[in-house]
Amino acid sequence: MEIVDLKKWIRDIPDFPEKGVIFRDITPLLKNPEVFKYSVEKIAELIKEWDFDCIVSPESRGFIFATPLAYLMNKEFVPIRKPGKLPYKTYSISYELEYGQTSLEMHVDAIDKGEKVIVVDDVLATGGTTKAIKELVDRAGGKTVGVVCLAELTYLNPRENLKDLEIASLIRY
């Protein structure tokens, strides 16, 4: 497939979920199988030299890219879920979002001690979600080495919060 301008496949929704926020809607990209496949393959290219064992990802839109990426790269996948969604014992963390507060959980046995982990998400905004996931991985004895995403919102300065991680993104706003 020829080079695709992925920004053309992401719709901007102003004032969603609240006034002053521009929501980057990836559903048009997902509707086109060739463009979706292209985006997953390009993400894999971005991180092919990274040394990691496992992909972790927050629900729900992160799963969309993380699971095919884990399959393509033959890596473990660990889902990071909202509270009450995982059936076994969990680590839990609460943190601030660009537009509110939320919590995430991960099974206590999801990450092996010393395992190298990357975070995969659809959009990297403030870096708050990745930072929270890194804390969950640390509690389990793993080491978060990087984050990769479809789109990075550079105007929110996520790299300032994630200085100790490799960061890669296909699209920058």
Swiss-Prot record:
Keyword vocabulary terms for this entry: Cytoplasm, Glycosyltransferase, Purine salvage, Transferase
Localization in the cell: Cytoplasm
Highest rank taxon of the organism: Bacteria
GO biological process: adenine salvage; AMP salvage; purine ribonucleoside salvage
Pathway terms, separated by semicolons: Purine metabolism; AMP biosynthesis via salvage pathway; AMP from adenine: step 1/1
Entry GO CC: cytoplasm
Any matching Pfam family: Pribosyltran
GO molecular function: adenine binding; adenine phosphoribosyltransferase activity; AMP binding
EC number, UniProt record: 2.4.2.7
CDD domains: PRTases_typeI
InterPro entries cross-referenced by the UniProt entry: Ade_phspho_trans, PRibTrfase_dom, PRTase-like, UPRTase/APRTase
Catalytic activity from the UniProt record: AMP + diphosphate = 5-phospho-alpha-D-ribose 1-diphosphate + adenine
Family annotation (HAMAP family): Aden_phosphoribosyltr
UniProt family annotation: Belongs to the purine/pyrimidine phosphoribosyltransferase family.
Function: Catalyzes a salvage reaction resulting in the formation of AMP, that is energically less costly than de novo synthesis.
Cited NCBIfam families: apt, PRK02304.1-3, PRK02304.1-5
Subunit structure: Homodimer.
Name of the protein this chain belongs to: Adenine phosphoribosyltransferase
